[in-house]
Amino acid sequence: MKIGILALQGAFAEHARMLEKLGIESVELRNLKNFQQHYSDLSGLILPGGESTAIGKLLRELYMLEPIKQAISSGFPVFGTCAGLILLAKEITSQKESHFGTMDIVVERNAYGRQLGSFYTEADCKGVGKIPMTFIRGPIISSVGKKVNILATVNNKIVAAQEKNMLVTSFHPELTNNLSLHKYFIDICKVA
């Protein structure tokens, strides 16, 4: 099994480290040719945290947005953390257009405020158990469609969800030593 990690900006190296701990090979995807070269060998894709506007702009400039969107729309498993969640959202409040727009969720960017408002907590995540959660100016999911399964909430705000083969978190599991969510994603990839 091999997992692609979008490596345009953000915490891609941290996700690679988590996969390595699980014995899973990963490949960094930096441009369209790179994506096309590896796509048929991949079992899934991770969209890391970072700055969603910058990543979205790079996806468009590198002509990666539509091919990746088509792959996700056809059922290709994807795990979006923080900015990756925003990229997958069908609607982003206070923003005219979405990026991939494949997941039936409405997202509020930077809902947890400035960098100084970042925090750490632990909470239950359906199908995974109690896990550590690191929030860095994280988004929140303000509403979900009927087919979206809410996996975790913190202070009555949705912070993790799944729709079919799409898994998202508004926090950064790659910044902890807990492998549970990455294992959960690998299980999604195995049955896809």
UniProtKB/Swiss-Prot annotation:
Annotated pathway:
Cofactor biosynthesis; pyridoxal 5'-phosphate biosynthesis
**Record SUPFAM superfamilies:** Class I glutamine amidotransferase-like
Q: Which domain of life is it from?
A: Bacteria
Q: In the record, what terms sit under GO molecular function?
A: glutaminase activity; pyridoxal 5'-phosphate synthase (glutamine hydrolysing) activity
Any idea which residues are catalytic in this one? 82, 172, 174
Instruction: State any GO BP term from the record.
Output: pyridoxal phosphate biosynthetic process
> Cellular component GO terms, alphabetically?
cytosol; glutaminase complex
Cross-referenced PROSITE patterns? PDXT_SNO_1, PDXT_SNO_2
Q: What is its EC number?
A: 4.3.3.6, 3.5.1.2
Q: Which family does it belong to?
A: Belongs to the glutaminase PdxT/SNO family.
Question: Which PANTHER family does the record associate with it?
Answer: PYRIDOXAL 5'-PHOSPHATE SYNTHASE SUBUNIT SNO, PYRIDOXAL 5'-PHOSPHATE SYNTHASE SUBUNIT SNO1-RELATED
Q: Subunit composition? A: In the presence of PdxS, forms a dodecamer of heterodimers. Only shows activity in the heterodimer.
Q: What is this protein called?
A: Pyridoxal 5'-phosphate synthase subunit PdxT
Q: Which organism is it from?
A: Haemophilus influenzae (strain ATCC 51907 / DSM 11121 / KW20 / Rd)
Q: Which gene encodes it?
A: pdxT
